[in-house]
Amino acid sequence: MTTKTLTEEPSRKRFKTNKSEIIFKEAYLEESTTTSSSSSSDQPPRQIKFTQKHQSILLITHLKDPLKVQTEYPIPDLQPHEILVHNRAIGLNPIDWKGKKYGFGIYHFPWINGRESSGDIVKLGEQVDTSSYAVGHKVIISSTSYRDNRTSTFQQYTAIDSRLVWKLPESFSYEDGATIGVGLVTAGVILYNSFGFELAEKPEQINGTILIWGGATVVGLYLSQLAKIYGLKVIAIASTKHEEYLRKLGVDYLIDRHLSEDEIIEKIDEIEEVESIEYGVDCVSKETSKTVLRILDHKLKKEEKEKDEEEDVKNTQVKPKFSGIVGIPKEYPETVDVRDVVIKRFHEDVSYGRKFIEITNKFLNTRQVEPVRFKQYKGGLHIIDDALKDLEKIGANGEKYVVSV
């Protein structure tokens, strides 16, 4: 874990920069007269009333204008199933800088970016299950409802569906929690929705292999861990400087991404334990998606050739499945079954999203899935712009960029 600090670590009240003084107001929590007076540490936090009306946000006023911290911005109102979360650590994603730079994913001005965070519940909607969630609970959130700025995380307080949040494991820091949302949801959608894996705490084991191009991306890191839970062998295409870390997370075979396409295929063919590749995922680009598709096509045809000549052998071969996070080429081999990555299912299909949260929260609690390592920026909303510039320039290099608020 590496850290970049704007100044000395700020108090939660205020800090100074060379540009301005940013004030972060603490939530004012007033005890309700109707609640229990129990002070046992084993009891859930008491019901308390949240009275704060305004917050600070990081605002996009125009695509060409710099990001702006604005104070006295209204705190989101809650829908019946929603909770209000005081963000304590915020995870950054490439779309947070790409959307502004290239003009996509921003539907109106002013606009608030940010897709994931971890923090404390400060307010409950009318229909929140109070047997599961209470004010003061620490949670992890992932906002896949991109058009709703209330769910964005580049602000002090985020409104989010209570049925779609993880509880932060006791052994995790807020920064650990901020690495999880988007990466784990995306990895899960690929396995459970695109590839049709069983969504279960103790799933049936799968005898097969998955190839992940971009094994050191955050999605790749979580995908490798989930794949191992299902018994898959994992081939990762990534920089060899991450080899020790990737093997720790479950990667069986690492192939240097700097090799040529033909050299990578040759390296894969040299793996004696892998006769076939049933699943392929690209986490990087449309161009690398083409390469993964070529590898899957090559491996299937090679397997067919090596088999004894049997009647209708080609018709009985199961097509390998492929999903590309960034994009899928318009043309691809007929030998590959190409599947879309439907991220929005997480929030649109609440029954699926809720079950996904339930199962993966158990994986996190038992450390079957570990939070990925992170690069920490201290300085709250005001340092997000610097962190995004680093993310654009350097890229996510086997770690998550996280801002502590």
Named regions from a protein language model:
Residues K4-S36, S40-Q79, H86-L124, D129-V405:
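Terminal helix/beta-alpha structural elements that buttress the NAD(P)+-binding lobe
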